[in-house]
């Protein structure tokens, strides 16, 4: 009694899937090693290869389509090329280990596969899908085309039996025995099926994609081949005739139209005729198109054209007999000259038979346009071929075609399935990508039947320590300007105060002592909190002058402005909008700063002991149009040379000493507790904090040696935060300074005790940075407190002690401890708090803070910071 008589379709499908699930469990057992799987594949492929002729004969006999010899070749291709391509591929367990990046890849089967096969390539497709399923340890259940059922089962049985004999699970390959379309649909929609491997007509492929599960389906092709005037004519004609006649044109990648440049049209046609192509006349064409599509060219019902299902894979002689025309006995393809591509010419549709449309191209663009029209005419995503020796034409063709395989100087049938004429993956399932409504654009192969798991070991982000290549320090170190090589055209960036104090003249005096003559241009219009508008003004002067060195002398404003002028001088295409965007990892930012130093060097000479800009990759620029302050950061902005000469600070007013000195303290403190703090920056940060507590008050009171120490402390802190970055104190201070026009050092100082206490609490929103493997800011504040001699036994005590010590230093230097003391109206301040907090969150300094600075928390800090400390 047959299976069909003893069970329903539902029972049959359930049984097949249940057996496949058992096979899947078997495949997952440890004994199925890579070596065993490869052995099974080898035995199964050889068994199918041994029967390639018998299978070809069975396919031709059952379907009545195609050519025996070509089907035999396709069977060999499925056994040989497909197996060769995956012979050394790892598909079991651990398939790749990358110790450098800490990634281990593990391959697992996707699960039970539903394999759907066509009438056009029944046995070769069954072999192909069976072998790639074995290679990936996936049980497969086939739904064979009813018109090729016997030969397909024959192919699957040969592979299955050989695989089981070699050790494969008993039900590794199965097939539906009855039920037709109903059974096929039930299999595709069965919850036990993991994926669908579908090759066939549009309706079947759409059904696969509608199943609600992953499907590897393909789309229809309408493949053009453009025979361009620079081609090898004999080769092109040979390829087209060979490809189109192969298995009577049943491969979906076969040419459906040849578009020939007018300059070589006659030669190509004659060459094709010598190879067996028969060109029909208009009367014969009318008969053929009527038979194949039910309509005639340019008739009223051309849009109703449908391919006669009897046509695919039939011989030219069969067509001649059906339509009542005569073709030579040795004719291998029928060619029909068409006027255009589209519904008006039915023969420019996909035909899957040895019938080829022929069109003449008036020029290269016309040829490409006609080919594009073919692809767009129900062939999107599949394939397109071109025969040409003009690289520019080939590239233009490839860029134009919405096809996933562009086959160059290649017969498209053999080129499309891969491995013979090129190195495309060998396959009988050709993906068409989104152009054709498919999930894959490549040739489907074993890769597509694997789930790749990735074991990712923890890896710290690469970190960096970068400072200017040359840093000169000690009193009177400005003299190095007379010795530095390659200075001839110097552009000095400064502000009017520096000019009035004679600092610019000091620089010019040293430059004039050089052994070579120098040209000097000065720009002294930099304002506090320099703007992009000022930068553009200075840049215009710089572009006219064309310097080979830029010298910035002054505080942070002059140096920051000079950095951006330098950038735009070397790279006028640089986009300020992109530069100001926030990032988490400097190396992975969305915008890449360009390489600097090709046109000029940047030499920075600080005249205040605070910003550290002379050694950092940062620049803070304001935009008068938006009223916002933007901290820019990239190592491209690191100056070429820093000259840290304390003589420029000896006459600084006390207020500037205090403001800039407290800025140094904040720089060092934030660098030390930053999530990006590291062994290279920690020592610098600690030393800077120590120098500030030992020397700031002395410097404030006029001690010249202490001023030298503070000048060094500023640069040391700059080197620390250049690599460790800053935190939320600076984020908020940037916004306060922009909104109320207060000195930067004063802003960060007022906020510092509040930020220390905030960061010193165990956070509920933890910071994200791989090297920062647990919260430790409270411990680090305690370390700083103990280093400067404060008594504390616990992190909590250390946090409070350090915050109070900072407050005491502020009071000792007569610095405000609340923004109210800056004569800011309380209502005006409070109204700005929400905006300042939000902008502070967007600030580039926020990501390195040791706890995530929540907007609401920053609002609380800003409100509290308005009121002076008692």
Curated annotation (Swiss-Prot):
Q: Which residues bind NAD(+)?
A: 431-436
Q: Which reaction does it catalyse?
A: a primary alcohol + NAD(+) = an aldehyde + NADH + H(+); a secondary alcohol + NAD(+) = a ketone + NADH + H(+); acetaldehyde + NAD(+) + CoA = acetyl-CoA + NADH + H(+)
Q: Which Gene3D superfamilies match?
A: 3.40.50.1970, Aldehyde Dehydrogenase, Chain A, domain 1 (3.40.605.10), Aldehyde Dehydrogenase, Chain A, domain 2 (3.40.309.10), Dehydroquinate synthase-like - alpha domain (1.20.1090.10)
- Superkingdom of source: Eukaryota
Q: Name one GO molecular function term.
A: collagen binding
Which residues are catalytic?
A: 252
Q: How is the co-factor bound, per the entry?
A: Zinc or iron.
The protein's UniProt keywords, in alphabetical order, are: Iron, Multifunctional enzyme, NAD, Oxidoreductase
Query: Which top EC class is named for this enzyme in its record?
Result: oxidoreductase
Q: Which GO terms describe its cellular component?
A: mitochondrion
Pfam families attached to this UniProt entry: ADH_Fe_C, Aldedh, Fe-ADH
Its assembly, as annotated, is: Seems to form a rod shaped homomer composed of at least 20 identical subunits.
What the protein does? This enzyme has two NAD(+)-dependent activities: ADH and ACDH. May be a critical enzyme in the fermentative pathway.
- Family recorded in the similarity comment: In the N-terminal section; belongs to the aldehyde dehydrogenase family.
Q: What is this protein called?
A: Aldehyde-alcohol dehydrogenase 2
Q: What is the source species?
A: Entamoeba histolytica (strain ATCC 30459 / HM-1:IMSS / ABRM)
């Amino acid at each position: 009694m047959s299976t069909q008589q003893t069970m329903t379709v539902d029972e049959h499908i359930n049984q097949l899937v249940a057996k496949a699930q058992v096979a899947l469990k078997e495949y997952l057992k440890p004994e199925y090693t890579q070596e065993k799987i490869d052995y099974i594949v080898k035995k199964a492929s050889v068994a199918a290869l041994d029967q390639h002729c018998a299978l070809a004969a069975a396919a031709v006999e059952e379907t009545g389509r195609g050519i025996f010899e070509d089907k035999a070749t396709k069977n060999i291709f499925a056994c040989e090329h497909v197996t060769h391509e995956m012979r050394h591929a790892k598909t079991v367990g651990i398939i790749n280990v990358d110790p450098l990046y800490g990634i281990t890849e593990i391959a697992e089967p996707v699960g039970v596969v539903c394999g759907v096969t066509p009438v056009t390539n029944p046995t070769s497709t069954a072999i192909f899908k069976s072998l790639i399923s074995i290679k990936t340890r996936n049980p497969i259940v086939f739904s064979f085309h009813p018109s090729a059922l016997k030969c397909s089962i024959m192919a699957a049985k040969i592979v299955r039996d050989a695989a089981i004999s070699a050790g494969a699970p008993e039900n590794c390959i199965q097939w539906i025995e009855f039920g037709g379309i109903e059974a096929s649909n039930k299999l595709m929609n069965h919850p036990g099926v993991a994926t669908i491997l579908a090759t066939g007509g549009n309706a079947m492929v759409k059904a696969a994609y509608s199943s609600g599960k992953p499907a590897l389906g393909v789309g229809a092709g309408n493949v053009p081949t453009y025979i361009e005037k620079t081609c090898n004519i004999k080769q092109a004609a040979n390829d087209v005739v060979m490809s189109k006649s192969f298995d009577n044109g049943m491969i979906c990648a076969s040419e459906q139209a040849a578009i020939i440049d007018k300059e070589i049209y006659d030669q190509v046609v004659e060459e094709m005729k010598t190879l067996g192509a028969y060109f029909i006349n208009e009367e014969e064409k009318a008969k053929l198109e009527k038979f194949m599509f039910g309509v005639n060219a340019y008739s009223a019902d051309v849009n109703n054209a449908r391919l006669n299902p009897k046509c695919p894979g039939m011989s030219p002689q069969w067509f001649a007999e059906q339509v009542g025309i005569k073709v030579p006995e040795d004719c291998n393809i029928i060619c029909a000259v068409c006027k255009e591509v589209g519904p008006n010419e039915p023969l420019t549709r996909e035909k899957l038979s040895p019938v080829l449309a022929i069109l003449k191209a008036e020029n290269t663009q016309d040829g490409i346009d006609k080919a594009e029209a073919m692809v767009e005419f129900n062939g999107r995503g599949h394939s397109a071929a071109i025969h040409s020796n003009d690289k520019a034409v080939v590239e233009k063709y490839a860029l134009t075609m919405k096809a996933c395989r562009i086959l160059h100087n290649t017969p498209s049938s053999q080129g499309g399935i891969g491995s013979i004429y090129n190195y495309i993956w060998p396959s009988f399932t050709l993906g068409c990508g989104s152009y054709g409504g498919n999930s894959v654009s490549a040739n489907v192969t074993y890769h597509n039947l694997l789930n790749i798991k990735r074991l990712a070991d923890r890896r710290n982000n690469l970190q960096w320590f970068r400072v200017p290549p040359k840093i000169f320090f000690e009193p009177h170190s400005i003299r190095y300007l007379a010795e530095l090589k390659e200075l001839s055209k110097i552009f000095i960036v400064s502000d009017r105060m520096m000019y009035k104090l004679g600092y610019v003249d000091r620089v010019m005096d040293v430059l004039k002592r050089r052994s070579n003559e120098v040209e000097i241009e000065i720009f002294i219009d930099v304002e506090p909190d320099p703007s992009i508008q000022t930068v553009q003004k200075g840049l215009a002067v710089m572009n006219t002058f064309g310097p080979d060195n830029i010298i910035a002398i002054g505080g942070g404003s002059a140096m920051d402005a000079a950095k951006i002028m330098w950038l735009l001088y070397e790279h006028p295409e640089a986009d300020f909008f992109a530069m100001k965007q926030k990032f988490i990892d400097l190396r992975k930012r969305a915008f890449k700063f360009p390489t600097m130093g090709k046109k000029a060097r940047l030499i920075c000479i600080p005249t205040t002991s605070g910003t550290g800009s002379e050694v950092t990759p940062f620049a803070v620029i304001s935009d008068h149009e938006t009223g916002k302050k933007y901290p820019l950061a990239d190592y491209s902005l690191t100056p070429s040379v820093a000259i840290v000469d304390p003589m420029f600070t000896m006459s600084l007013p006390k207020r500037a000493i205090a403001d800039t000195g407290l800025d140094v303290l904040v720089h060092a403190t934030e660098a030390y507790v930053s999530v990006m703090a590291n062994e290279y920056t920690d020592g610098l940060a600690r030393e800077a904090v120590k120098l500030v507590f030992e020397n700031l008050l002395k410097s404030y009171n006029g001690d010249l040696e202490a001023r030298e120490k503070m000048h060094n402390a500023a640069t040391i802190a700059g080197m620390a935060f250049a690599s460790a970055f800053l935190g939320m104190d600076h984020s908020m201070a940037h916004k306060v300074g922009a909104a109320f026009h207060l000195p930067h050092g004063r802003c960060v100082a007022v906020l510092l005790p509040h930020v220390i206490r905030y960061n010193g609490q165990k956070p509920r929103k933890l910071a994200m940075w791989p090297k920062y493997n647990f919260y430790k800011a409270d411990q680090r504040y305690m370390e700083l407190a103990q280093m400067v001699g404060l008594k504390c036994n616990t992190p909590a005590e250390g946090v409070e002690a350090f915050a109070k010590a900072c407050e005491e230093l502020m009071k000792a230097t007569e610095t405000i401890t609340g923004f109210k003391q800056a004569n800011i109206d309380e209502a005006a301040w409070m109204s700005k708090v929400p905006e300042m907090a939000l902008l502070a969150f967007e600030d580039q300094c926020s990501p390195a803070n040791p706890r995530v600075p929540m907007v609401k928390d920053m609002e609380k800090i800003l409100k509290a910071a308005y009121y002076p400390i008692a």
